[in-house]
Every structure is written in C-alpha cells, then in structure tokens.
Regions:
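Soluble FAD-dependent oxygen oxidases
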Residues: 2-502
Length: 502
C-alpha cells in the first residue's frame, strides 16, 4: 500500500506529526477528555430554555449528558474549553435563532463546522457554539453544480461528489469542515489545476449578525460574497450552505519521494525551481523534517496517468543533483481513492475518517501550527533547512501558482495569488508540552520571517502571529474591514483575530 504521512513519521519516530506530511494532523488517541482546567471569562448570558424550544436540533449545556463530547474540537489542546452551550443545528432557522439570541443578550457566539481552528477559535470559553455538523448534505445537480451544507466534512464531500462523477478542489484532511476551508481560501492537492476551493463558489447562504439569512453571489451583495472567498472563518456571519461549480472527477497519479538524511538543501533547492516550471496538472509539496540533520521528502499528484508524471519526476531528480530517493512510490488512483490516500485513511470507511464518528478518536491530535508565505524561489535554500536543524518540527511547503495565480489578488479576499508556496510549520505535542512546543514554533516562525517575509495563511491561524491582520490579508484588509463594519457593526462575530477587532 502507498506510504502516507502517518506511517512515514511513525517510522521516523516523530509520532504526533505523522499525518502532517500531507497536511492533516492526527493519529489514534482514545483517552477521555481532560478535566476542566480553566474557567472562561464572564460574559452576558443567553436565556437557554426559550432558545432550546426554538431549535429543531439539540441545545446541550454543561449539566446535560453529552456535553463532554459535544464541546470537544479536533485538537485536544483545547479540551479544557468550557462553552456555555452547544447548539446542534439542523436547519437554517436554528442558526438564525442562535444568532438572534446571542445578539439580544450581547453574548459571545462562534460557528463550528469541523472544529479544526489551529487557535481553537471555534470553541471559545463561555460562548454559544453553533455546531453545523448535522447540516452536512451534499446535493449534485444535473449541470454539475453542488449544494453543500456548512457542516459537511471533506471526506463526505469527496465521497458524495464521486458518486456523481464529480470533484471539487479542496483540502486533504478528511474531517476538516468545508466551511472553514472555503472561507479561508482552500488550498489543496488540485489547486494548481483547478484553483482554490473558494474559486469554485457560485453562491453562499449566510446568516449575518442581524439574524437575516442572505444568499450572496457575484450579482447579489457582491461585497459580502467577495469577503467570504478568503476572508477567514468566524467573520461576517455563519454560513449554512455553499453552491459550488465542480469538475469531472479526474484520474490521479500520486507520488512520494523520500531522500537521504542530509540532502534537504538540495531537495528544497531543486524542488522550488521544478515546481515553478511544472504544468498545472502537477501539484507537489516539499516537506522538510527537522532533525540532526533535517531530511526532505517530496509528495504530490498529477492529473493524468503515470506515463505523464514519470518524465516530470525525472526532471526533478536532475534538478536536485541526481540524488536517488530512498523510497519512490508512484500509484494511479481514481479521484476519490487519490483523496483518501492523501487523507491517510485509505483503509477506513468514510465514517471512520471522521475524528469523532461513533466516538472514534483515531485522528485527534495535539499540535501547534503556524505559517509563512514563500513568494519567490529562495536564493539559499539551506537557510530554511538550518532553521529546523536539531528540532522535532515539520515545515510543509505547498506549491501554488498555476490556476491559483491566474486570479488577481483583489478579485477575492485571498491575497496570496502571486505566491510560489505556502509554508506550514507544524509541531506535534501534548497538553503538558504545549508551552514548549508553542515557544519552539514561534522561534521557527520568526526565523523564517527574516528569510521569506511576514505573510501567512489564515487557515493556519496562529494566536501569536505578529501583525496578523496584515499577514493574513495584505492589501485586502481595508476592504474586509469595510464589509465587516457594514454587516456586523456591533461586533457580534468577534474573537482575538477577528476582522472586527482591527
């Protein structure tokens, strides 16, 4: 079977970072939630019994069975969070009732789809959590458009679309929610061929701070539609459904090349020149795995058969000095199997790919993460590698350009259209090791800033990111502020890095 990130890093002894080789943290953890460790700040309270009577779904408060599981997000580092209640919404009217109740009380509210916020912003203390996981339908129309509920997980989206012979360019982590991914842009293994997930959006149904359900598009409230295409989850309102254009499901050829320890500078140097010259059909990432010395691996996929990919891999080998990989895997898949390969759950059912399906905790993982943006090829790739020398960390450098770069930065809220790649910094940890991991992550991030600059990807949101608003949004920040002021003048949808807070 193809070697995935999880098996690779377990073999390397890096444990918690295993699944991160393709961008989705997680290995099996079956321990119960940690006890409450902190109490959140005191906020105005919603009168929950009247709200509960308005909902078709459940409203779970701390005194009710199921609260311990319902409050939990993807990352166990946030298992000490104590929301005031979790509203398990089933229809748009439930979401409207929650928004109206929070606005009337002046109480904090947050939407949660997959619960993958790197900073835990979808599970704040003392807030009403609007859990959209039951609003997860995927309907494919005859013309190939797909209407997808705001709570759908990526593995379910891919599975449903495959049944209709369609595909949507999106992320690789199976339990990530379609909402957070799309609202931050949506980088994935098909981005160079088809663009970001948000580039496929035709319309969005969103409940704004006044409780109104709005369906927005390029022709209906276009400023809000623009902001929802890269402006970040948690801002502007709660999205209940998306309408996407999809593409015919392509054949994919996946690959992984692992190179000898000590060759990482040559691997990164060759890869960055290679990906800059590849056709749109080729997507790839270069992973630099910390150690003494660091090592490098290149993974990716090609839209087409192996016969089209193999000459491109030969070119890569030449560019890195004809170093022979210690492992070379090339395998053809249909689109769904290819996405399951990158998700690291090829041997599991769609339900088992969820982080909390039937109580299954197989891919919950404690980690810290952040990002930087690589705008142009590095003059000295060894500088990046040296940052990871002696560290148990991983930098995943995902190639962009192609279709992503053919849309202007001002045309959507996602600002990094001209970038060569995103750089995700990832450290597996534990609740007791969190402070040390966060410190190490910040050191790596800040050292990389001196090499590549201060840009960052909002979907790898980092609570300690310096100059975060400019880093995430660049020249689009002013317009995003204007949209937020128009649709959320009282700052209902707020959190430490909300657009309403700048």
């Amino acid at each position: 079977m193809p070697i995935n990130r999880r098996t690779f890093l377990h073999a390397a002894g890096l444990g918690a970072a295993a699944a991160a080789l393709t961008g989705c943290g997680g290995t099996q953890t079956t321990s119960p939630p940690r006890p409450f460790e902190t109490a959140g700040p005191v906020h105005p309270s919603i009168d929950f019994p009247p709200l509960a009577r308005k909902l078709s779904g459940s409203l779970i408060t701390p005194d009710q069975p199921g609260y311990q599981l319902a409050r939990r997000s993807f990352n166990p580092l946030f298992d000490n969070r104590t929301p005031a209640a979790i509203a398990q919404c089933r229809r748009i009217e439930d979401v409207q009732a929650c928004v109206s109740a929070a606005a009337a009380a002046g109480a904090p509210i947050a939407a949660r789809s997959g619960g993958h916020s790197y900073a835990g912003y979808s599970t704040p203390d003392s807030a009403l959590i609007v859990d959209l996981s039951a609003m997860s339908s995927v309907e494919v129309n005859a013309g190939g458009t797909a209407v997808i509920g705001g709570g759908a997980r990526l593995i379910d989206v891919y599975t449903a679309l495959a049944g209709a012979g369609r595909c949507l360019p999106a992320g690789s982590c199976p339990s990530v929610g379609i909402a957070g991914l799309t609202l931050g842009g949506g980088i994935g293994v098909l981005s160079r061929k088809y663009g970001l997930t948000c580039d496929q959006l035709l319309s969005v149904t969103v409940v704004t701070a006044d409780g109104t359900a709005r369906t927005v598009s390029a022709s209906a409230e276009p400023d809000l539609f623009w902001a929802l295409r890269g402006g970040g989850g948690g801002n502007f309102g709660i999205v209940t459904s998306f309408t996407f254009a999809t593409v015919p499901a392509p054949q994919l050829t996946v690959f992984q090349l692992d190179f000898p320890v000590g060759s990482a500078p040559d691997v990164l140097g060759g890869w960055q020149q290679w990906i800059s010259n590849m056709p749109d059909e080729l997507w790839s990432k270069c992973n630099i795995i910390g150690g003494s010395p660091p090592s490098g691996t290149v993974i990716g996929c090609y839209v087409g058969p192996a016969s089209g990919l193999n000459p491109l891999l030969t070119d890569l080998n030449h560019r890195i000095g004809n170093r022979q990989p210690t492992l070379r895997t090339v395998a053809e898949h249909d689109c769904l199997d290819g996405m399951r390969y990158f998700a690291g759950c090829s041997a599991k059912s769609a339900a088992e790919c969820h982080d909390q399906a039937s109580g299954n905790q197989w891919n919950r993982e404690a980690f810290v993460g952040t990002s930087r943006i690589l705008t142009t090829p590095l003059a000295d790739p060894a500088q990046i590698v040296s940052v990871l020398d002696g560290r148990r960390a991983l930098v995943m450098i995902d190639g962009l350009r192609g279709a992503v770069g053919r849309i202007r930065s001002a045309d959507t809220a996602f600002p990094h259209r001209d970038a060569l790649a995103t750089m995700q910094i990832y450290l597996g940890t534990s609740p007791t090791g969190r402070a040390a991991a966060a410190s190490s992550m910040a050191q790596i991030r800040d050292q990389l800033t001196g090499i590549v600059g201060g840009g960052a990807y909002v979907n790898y949101i980092d609570a300690g990111m310096p100059n975060w608003a400019q880093a995430y949004y660049g020249d689009n920040l002013t317009r995003l502020r204007q949209v937020a002021q128009r649709y959320d003048p009282d700052r209902l949808f707020t959190f430490p890095q909300a657009i309403t807070s700048v």
